[in-house]
Amino acid sequence: MEIRQHEWLSASPHEGFEQMRLKSRPKEPSPSLTRVGANFYSSVKQQDYSASVWLRRKDKLEHSQQKCIVIFALVCCFAILVALIFSAVDIMGEDEDGLSEKNCQNKCRIALVENIPEGLNYSENAPFHLSLFQGWMNLLNMAKKSVDIVSSHWDLNHTHPSACQGQRLFEKLLQLTSQNIEIKLVSDVTADSKVLEALKLKGAEVTYMNMTAYNKGRLQSSFWIVDKQHVYIGSAGLDWQSLGQMKELGVIFYNCSCLVLDLQRIFALYSSLKFKSRVPQTWSKRLYGVYDNEKKLQLQLNETKSQAFVSNSPKLFCPKNRSFDIDAIYSVIDDAKQYVYIAVMDYLPISSTSTKRTYWPDLDAKIREALVLRSVRVRLLLSFWKETDPLTFNFISSLKAICTEIANCSLKVKFFDLERENACATKEQKNHTFPRLNRNKYMVTDGAAYIGNFDWVGNDFTQNAGTGLVINQADVRNNRSIIKQLKDVFERDWYSPYAKTLQPTKQPNCSSLFKLKPLSNKTATDDTGGKDPRNV
């Protein structure tokens, strides 16, 4: 005991404390318990690693999915953007046939075409032009690829003795269908035409426009496009009376694909409405106008520097860059400095519904403005027939009244009356002659001309479908100028015995008519025509 105590006391202080520390340490676990703990720890650690790997993979998968969604959304947005760009951009006005403002033909020939009813006699030195029938036949004879026609009437195959020209035209159209020439025709859905059905059976493509559903109106457009090169625009539809009984007027453009480039889009607009009962809220960019009143087509007409554009009605049918007919007429009247000559069948500034009639001032007010504010001379040549509205005389009297006691205010009005001249016809002529009517629809000034499909009646412009043509020329004195030719036609009719002043009950002097010479065979061969007055 003493020895152990001595040993402890003799030991160094550091050694004693170390031994005490070692003795105070807990006993180490047995090897078996150590192995179990190690295995448990390893298992937990492995599970934790697996969970972390799974979470990392899940994060990567979610991130990858998000990237795919973002990429897909970007691709869709890019595709939509490209589609919108290509639908919005119309490079240089190019159409589906590759025709564009860069490669179209703007050096054109233009000719007036007229339809002079049988028995309508002018003086020997009066101007005459190519007959409507011959002009149409010329176009069909020139056709090699396509014929596109818009017309409100399709009654060519009639049994009346004066319907022979209509029958010949119908036979020519049938012939073209067998020559691999593409025929496209547009008509109003109300047209019950055996001619259209016959042409359709032969392969012609026929589009019926439901103007009643679109705008409570009807189709009155009348124009042709042949081989994407030649154009007719005028008052006449494809009706045997337009080639026999009615006085019609229009123009034919030859080799004028620049004008076709624009007019073809109106035809395409009509065709796009096939089988549709409503007008789309937005028109395709391919139907936008190429030229309008702000951007006129620059061209040569019979080697005369000219400008031109086509207009459309109703306003519902005027996509972007397409001039409304009323605006086109405004531009012609506003540019007039000396005179405005207007030849239409009816003049009635009234908009009518089934329950009421309201004043429609659009054109009436423009005429008054030209008379009073700019001292432009105005002449109105209207038709007098059984459907002339009595209110027409009231409005004409009102127009004349505003020039009372106003210096340099000149308005003159005449009625072109072919019906009363039947009193001068022989018994044989009366037995087989249908009512004749002047259906011209044009205006000419000292620098421009407008040729359209409408009379100057409110409902025509607001509800019906029609196309107009405006031509501007600086040099209107040479005989090749279409504006001078149109002015000469107006003055020929104005000074003829068929044009009467505001006295609708006065009977004609038959003896004065017998002094006039009939048309020569050269000019009268194909000039007999007009429109069915029941459908005007």
Curated annotation (Swiss-Prot):
Intrachain disulfide bonds: none
Assigned keywords, A-Z: Glycoprotein, Membrane, Repeat, Transmembrane, Transmembrane helix
One Pfam family from the record: PLDc_3
UniProt KW Ribosomal protein keyword: no
A GO CC annotation given for this chain: membrane
Residue span, PLD phosphodiesterase domain: 215-242, 434-460
InterPro entries per the UniProt record, alphabetical: Diverse_PLD-related, PLDc_3, PLipase_D/transphosphatidylase
Family (UniProt): Belongs to the phospholipase D family.
The protein's name: Inactive phospholipase D5
Gene: PLD5
